[in-house]
A protein has these predicted regions:
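Conserved, surface-exposed functional patches that form binding/active-site neighborhoods
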Residues: 91-97, 104-105, 109-121
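Hydrophobic alpha-helical connector segments
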Residues: 63-100
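Helix-turn-helix
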Residues: 10, 14, 18-52
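Alpha-helical DNA-contacting segments of helix-turn-helix folds
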Residues: 54-61, 68
Length: 167
């Protein structure tokens, strides 16, 4: 039996759908209300401002990513760097669109990315602390992040098959 998502999750899904369909520039409280089938007041109850909606989107992305890393660590015996790279490969197109929207909005409000900064700092620390070769692990993590950003910005000069061959 499918459980109906709670209102907050429904709103985050609606925001993600808007960004994926028409881009971050069209993400408004009114658009989220319409997409979610809720009133503007219902949206404002959960997210009193667009900034808080964006924070909710970021927290959702980070939680989702951390869950994927954990799942990969449980499925394979290997370092966190391997789980991180596999989790990045699992990212959906909606998640990429959300990340891009957050990045664009962070240009106006750099503090929006504070939770992501803490998350990445903790990850780099975890990767380095368990690595036999800290420099190599750091380079691998930086390369994986570079690959993800090139892909997110639609600048990656590799086919899906070529990218798949890299892991």
């Amino acid at each position: 039996m499918n459980k109906r998502p709670d209102s907050k999750a429904r709103l985050l899904d609606a925001a993600s759908a808007i960004v994926a369909k028409v881009g971050a520039g069209h993400l408004t409280i009114d658009a989220v209300a319409a997409e979610a089938g809720m009133s503007k007041g219902g949206v404002l109850y959960h997210f009193p401002s667009k900034h808080l909606l964006l924070e909710g989107m970021l927290n959702s992305l980070l939680t989702d990513f951390e869950d994927r890393v954990t799942r990969h660590r449980e499925q394979q015996d290997g370092p966190v760097i391997k789980a991180w790279i596999l989790a990045e490969q699992d990212q959906t197109s909606n998640q990429r669109s959300m990340a891009l929207a957050l990045l664009a909005n962070a240009a106006e409000n750099p503090n929006l990315l504070d939770p992501a900064r803490k998350f990445v700092q903790r990850t780099f620390s975890d990767v380095r602390s368990e690595a036999e070769d800290q420099d190599l692990s750091t380079i691998l993590l930086l390369a994986a992040e570079g690959l993800r950003f090139l892909d997110m910005l639609d600048l990656l000069p590799l086919t899906d098959d070529e990218r798949g061959d890299l892991h």
